[in-house]
Structures are given as structure tokens and as C-alpha cells.
Swiss-Prot record:
Transport system for both nitrate and nitrite, with much higher affinity for nitrate than for nitrite. The gene is nrtP. It comes from Nostoc punctiforme (strain ATCC 29133 / PCC 73102). GO terms for cellular component: plasma membrane. Pfam families: MFS_1. It is found in: Cell inner membrane. Signal peptide: none annotated. This is Nitrate/nitrite transporter NrtP.
Amino acid sequence: MLKKLFSFSDRYRILHQTWFAFFLTFVCWFNFAPFATTIGKELHLAPEQIKTLGICNLALTIPARLIIGMLLDRFGPRITYSILLMFAVVPCLATALAQDFNQLVISRLLMGIVGSGFVVGIRMVAEWFQPKEMGIAQGIYGGWGNFGAFGAEFALPILAISTSFFSGGASNWRLAIALVGIITAIYGVIYYNTVQDTPRGKVYKKPKKNGSLEVTSIKSFWAMMISNFGLIFALGLLAWRLEQKKIHFLTLSQMYLTWLVLAGLFAYQSYKAWQVNRELLTGKKTYPVSERFQFGQVALLEFTYITNFGSELAAVSMLPAFFEKTFGLEHVVAGMIAATYPFLNLVSRPSGGLISDKFGSRKWTMTIISVGIGVSYLMAHFINSNWPIPVAIAVTMFAAYFAQAGCGATYSIVPMIKKEATGQIAGNVGAYGNFGGVVYLTIFSLTDAPTLFSTMGIAALICAFMCAFFLKEPKGSFAPAYEGEASETATKSSVFLTEE
């Protein structure tokens, strides 16, 4: 595959167009962090408000990834991604025109929807590439797309400075953010007109039922319910944070009302899950062994994504301000240094997928990388102003490599679970990455950077233990074609994790 990577024909063209779509959504999603201190000074924001905006940036991505996953499985990645790209201009312009904290909160909440675009490409890539090369294909998609976070950290400050003549010599952050949204919307139109959901002659397989994931055992149903509650909890945590005295975006009664709405959302979500799985729960339907999958394995992948992508979200959001305050740097310089973290996505996430393809065990690849995440963040815990800046950068890049390689390893497994429900499963796993980001950034907003780093390190080591003892090796994960598919033509269901 690597030899033909830059041929830009057939499936490789689709891969490149799709990772670039993801790249643009990430540039949009992270366009606030490089300007956090500048915006804070201009709009007179307190440090706690800036931290809260970082949490808001992640919040709606949690339900959005679930919804996008269902829409994706029903309508296909071409339509879903195109609409999402065109929508990106709305929160970008809202941020660029914001005049106070409340307007920024609304714009960053909407921007979280754009951050759900990652899920779409997972299904697109899974349709065009074989299981034996799924790791590297998903790694390139995820890694090169995630490079958009670097594009935001590094390029946007330069763009803002280069257009400063429009704002009387001051850094023109508003124009930089607006331009990114406009470019992304234009690319959405291009994407719609130039890609296809599947190779010619291949059937795009859709779930038989919509509204919730169809599981194959009662045990998996209850595991899914617990998983769904965790995501609602993350949104409730955000509402609590927005009610705190130093933030006070919500009143106490508004917070309780938000919790009530979230409880209603969970009840509705549970009803839809029961409706989709009613025949299973009432004993009217049983699934043959070949069609079963364990939702517990999905839950483990959700945990891995908390520790790798969740920590990456937190790090990318707080590192510019961390370097600026710890070492007394100018915000542009601090942003460029912090950009070394997302910069590594270009190679680290693909390498995680490639190692998973070549190592011979996706389970042990995931376990070893999780250990690396834990150790590297525990090292970052000790960074302070007495450290040489190059050493601090090196430790940051060490943490970045393992966190991003872990993302590649996670999504080398996700498409192997149940092919026709890849969107929903990828949405669940991806949403838990945002869950991790919200929890980690909430911890950061209440404590400090060393506490955040140690928390992320300990969580990753616990995850490594869970993977070593409970994660199962996906069946058929090194096969030349999906189970039941003859080369490019889909005929039967593709299920790779069987329930015992």
C-alpha cells in the first residue's frame, strides 16, 4: 500500500480527499487555542473563562459523534461529510464576530459539532481498504487529518499577523478564523462532487434498524446502556462547570434544567435502544455465533480512546498557554512550540496503525502503546520553569507520539467489529475521546498542569492493564478481505469479534 500511497488514483485519491476533509475540520475545531490569550485580553476574559471555553469546544462533539455515526451508516460518508464541512462556516463566523464570553460559549459549543467529522472518514476508509491494511489506512486518515490541529496552532497565528494591516497592526485573529471557515465550506462542495461511498460494484451496507446500535446479547445491551450514561454524565459535568461562580454562564436553576433535559435525552436514547433491540430482550430473537459481537470490547476501545485521544485533546487545548506561562514566552512563540504536539500526528498515528498491521497482534500493540502513554505523561508531570525548553519540548513530543500512535491502534480495530455499523461504533468510541477531553480539561480547570499530566498518565496505565487482560484479538484482522466479502464485493455481514 505505501508504494502507491501518492498515486492519487482510485482508493488512494479517496483517502487523500477524505483526510484533507478531516484536516480542515480540525483546523476549524482548534482555531481558538492559538489565540486564547489574545482573545482573553481583548474581550477581558478571566483565566477560568478561557479554560471553560476549551471545555465547551469539546462538549457537543460527544452527542454529535453519536448522531453523525447513525446518519453516516444511513446516508453514507459522501453526503454526511459534505454537509458537515459546509456547516463549519457557521461557528467560525460566530467566533470571529463574538464580542463577549457568552457569544464565545455559543460559538465554541457549535464548533464541537464540526469536531465530529472524524467519524465519517472511518467508514469511508473502511469501505475502500482491506482488513490487512486497515491500520495504516486508518492511521494515515487519522494522523494526516489530525495534523489540522498543528495547522491551527502554527499557521493561524502567522495568518493573523500577516493580515494585521486590516486591524491597525494588531494580530487579526478574527479574519484568520473566518477565512478558515469559508475555505472549509468551499471544500465541502468540492468533496460532494468528487468522491463516492464505495468502489464500483460494491454494496454500501446499512444497518437493518436505525435509531440505536443493534447488539447481539442482553449482556451487551446493558453494557451499551452504561456506555450511553457515561456520555450524558460528561455533558452534565460541563453544565456544572458553567454554573460555577467564576464562570456563571448558567444560573443554578438553569443548570438543574439542563440536567433535567439530559435525563430526558438519556431516557429517549434508552427507549430507542430498547425499540431496536426489543426482539432480543423479549427472547423472540437470538443471533447465530457468527453474527455476535461483544459490546464489552467496544467499551474497552472507548477507554483506550479516552486515554489517547482524550489526552491529546486536553494537551492541544492547554499547551500553548502552558508554555507561555511556564517559560514566559510570547503567545506566538508558545503556540508554535506547543504545535510540536499535534505536528507529530503526521507520522505517529500512521505508525501506530502500521505497527498494529505488522506486529501480528492488535491487542498487544494497543497494550504496549498504552504503557508508553502512561509513562510519558508521568514524565511531563515534572516539567517546570527550571527545565531547559528543548527538554520540555522533547518530553511533550514523547507523550504526543504514544498518544497519537494509540489512536491509530484503536481505529485499526474499530472497523473489525461489525462492518455495517462501523459509523455507530466509531461514533461511540470517538465520543468517549471527547468524554476524556472534557473530564481532563475539567480537572485542569480546577487544578493545574502537573495534576492534569499525572491524571492522564495514571489513567493510561490502568487502560494498559485492562487491555492486557480483557481485550480480545479481533478475528480476521489480517485477512485480505472482510469476512463474507469476495474481494471488493460485499455479500454477507462482516463481524470480527465473536461473543463467548
